[in-house]
Amino acid sequence: MSMPGINVSNLLNEHEELGLRLLAGEKGLTNRINMSEINRPGLSLTGFYESFAHDRIQIFGKGEWAYITSRIPEDLKNIAADFFSFHLNCIIFTHGNMPPPIFTENCERLAIPLMISDVSTHKFITLISGILDRSLAPRTMRHGVLIEVFGIGILLSGKSGVGKSETALELIERGHRLVADDMVEIRRLSESYLIGTCSDLLRHHMEIRGLGILNIKDIFGIGSVRDHKLIELIIRLEEWTEDKDFDRTGLENPTEELLGVQIPLIRVPVKPGRNIPIIVETAAMNQRLRKLGKNAAQEFNQKLSNYLQQGKVERNPP
């Protein structure tokens, strides 16, 4: 698992929706941002710096801007001295408000990027929080195929050559959608949600033994692919052998941990004659039912228990 960070320059140059413009501190554009939370200094500007989150992006909205621009020069000088005594990664003024010159001077001197945006504070915080959540989410790479089947994100896993890509290709031909083949990039967006995607280089491509590299979007159309998908089920394809035990009732609820999140796991034996794509489709529909609170295995088990208790089933038939 990796915990990536991003540079301030990434926000400035790669996210036009933020509408950022650099005013000072260009030398600090390589400053790292390592957390998705932001901070509005607010009370800190009055001199209360206890628990001041200086390691976050500092957002100056209308309130902060109105306060510092209404101070007399001597007070503003003291505010700036206290504020810039902390190590800051960047400062952003929203609503297009221009910071006072003393802020520009300090940011240039200390190599702290100072930026402004015409976007309102509320909208800006919503936008940048989403960007940081996605960019800084814990992530890992996983060998397998991620495909959307009946709206369920399924990660097909298993040893190389077991038939993951071939199974996915048949599912795509049936109208389902490919997300990633071979290497799946997985990010944890919250304590219980994992998003799978693919690198830009491999996106929309599959490798099939005997055919080589295929462009799925070109062959099956734009409706056969998508860029990312929530991972809700893992199906592990395993070569069938007599000494392996596989679940035959559905009463077991095994899971596999990915980035600290438990994902439902189904082990499917692979051998000649088995129609794996239809099994995957059925597993997807069954998973949707389970999300709605319907569990066929548990219902059947309960019904059987009731029959046994009522004597409706002969335990030792002749």
UniProtKB/Swiss-Prot annotation:
InterPro entries per record: HPr(Ser)_kin/Pase (IPR003755), Hpr_kin/Pase_C (IPR011104), Hpr_kin/Pase_Hpr_N (IPR011126), P-loop_NTPase (IPR027417), Ser_kin/Pase_Hpr-like_N_sf (IPR028979)
Residues at the active site: H143, K164, D182 (proton acceptor), R248
Binding site for ATP: G158, K159, S160, G161, V162, G163, K164, S165
Molecular function terms from GO: ATP binding; magnesium ion binding; phosphorelay sensor kinase activity; protein serine/threonine kinase activity; protein serine/threonine/tyrosine kinase activity
Residues reported in the UniProt entry to bind Mg(2+): S165, E207
Catalytic activity: [HPr protein]-L-serine + ATP = [HPr protein]-O-phospho-L-serine + ADP + H(+); [HPr protein]-O-phospho-L-serine + phosphate + H(+) = [HPr protein]-L-serine + diphosphate
Cofactor(s) named in the record: Mg(2+)
Region of interest called Important for the catalytic mechanism of both phosphorylation and dephosphorylation, as start-end residue ranges on this chain: 206-215
Location of the region described as Important for the catalytic mechanism of dephosphorylation in the Swiss-Prot/TrEMBL record: 269-274
Example of a GO biological process term: regulation of carbohydrate metabolic process
Further remark: Both phosphorylation and phosphorolysis are carried out by the same active site and suggest a common mechanism for both reactions.
Family: Belongs to the HPrK/P family.
Listed name of the protein: HPr kinase/phosphorylase
Gene behind the chain: hprK
